Every structure is written in structure tokens, then in C-alpha cells.
Regions:
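Structural core segment of the AMP-binding/adenylate-forming
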Residues: 5-7, 71-72, 99-167
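Conserved AMP-binding/adenylate-forming core of the ANL superfamily
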Residues: 19-87, 91-94, 112-117, 167-168
């Protein structure tokens, strides 16, 4: 069974249950409590410290990204590079790529400018999805990268002129 079918099945069976959780490491939890107790003690901090999405939302975001890729002409077998930090949105983007039949090419978030360019060329990616943390590394090579590739920006803040904004 393809992994995208497993996502669809989990969506049908557990739609409103939590699928993914992101913990914000910049706001470390200092109390040894359960999440329910933590919410009772400090409701405003828990929301900032922890983000989550349900199976329904996960699947919806994956479908939305898959449809965007299809609208832009990405076909089965083409390659989509993913250059994002570990975040809640990473997996829906990954599954969106798989739903199109394209191949996901995860890039290491530690790559510098030259390594990103080398890997993008070596893997012959047709699309690069990147986050705000990588604008500085991509800017020097943006003209070369965007010449024959789609560039999708995902994140907060302004989207660079050489990319298309994709913020769900």
C-alpha cells in the first residue's frame, strides 16, 4: 500500500485526531506536567510552545500542495527539492509531492550555498520549496536556480522576488 494511501486511510479513520505535533524549542517547557495540566496552569504559553494538526488538516494541506504542483505542470517522475527546517509543514509538503507522483528530494538544512546548488543540479530538481531560513543562502544563486526551476517560498515574512509565495 503506497504511503499516500495510508494518509488517506488515517484521515478517514482518525480525521479529527492529532496527526502531527511541533514543539517550539525556543520556548522550552520548564514544568514537569501533563499537557492537560500545563494548559490549566498556563493556557497562553502552551499554545505558543506546541502546535498540532489533525489528520484531516494534514491531508488537506498535502492535497493543496499536490494541486499547486499539478497546476504548475509538475508530472510524475519529476523532482521536487525540499529545503526546510524540521517543522510542522514539512510532512504535508512531502506528501503533496508524493501524491503528484513526483519524487521528493529532501535537502539537508545544513547545506551552504554551494552545496545547495550542487545538489539541485546533481538531482536535476524541477522545483525547490524553501523556507525563510534559507533566503540568505539561496539569494546569491537565485538567478541560476530559478532560470529553469519553479521556486516556492514557504514561511513568514516577505517572499523574495525570484520565488512564488506558498504559505498555507
Amino acid at each position: 500500500m503506497p504511503i499516500t494511501d495510508i494518509l488517506e486511510k488515517n484521515c478517514r479513520l482518525y480525521g479529527d485526531d492529532v496527526a502531527l505535533v511541533e514543539i517550539n524549542p525556543e520556548m522550552p517547557e520548564t514544568k514537569r506536567t501533563t499537557w492537560k495540566e500545563f494548559d490549566l496552569i498556563e493556557p497562553s504559553r502552551a499554545a505558543y510552545y506546541r502546535r498540532e494538526i489533525t489528520w484531516n488538516v494534514f491531508n488537506e494541506k498535502a492535497n493543496r500542495f499536490a494541486n499547486l504542483l499539478i497546476e504548475r505542470g509538475i508530472k510524475k517522475g519529476e523532482k521536487v527539492g525540499i529545503l526546510l527546517m524540521n517543522c510542522l509543514e514539512w510532512l504535508p509538503i512531502y506528501f503533496g509531492v508524493l501524491k503528484t507522483g513526483a519524487l521528493a528530494v529532501p535537502f539537508n538544512f545544513r547545506y551552504d550555498t554551494d552545496e545547495i546548488k550542487y545538489c539541485a543540479d546533481l538531482a536535476e530538481v524541477d522545483v525547490i520549496v524553501f523556507g525563510s531560513n534559507f533566503i540568505g543562502r539561496l539569494e546569491p544563486i537565485a538567478d541560476e536556480l530559478s532560470r529553469n526551476r519553479l521556486m516556492f517560498y514557504f514561511g513568514e515574512g516577505g517572499c523574495p522576488a525570484w520565488a512564488e509565495d506558498y504559505s498555507s
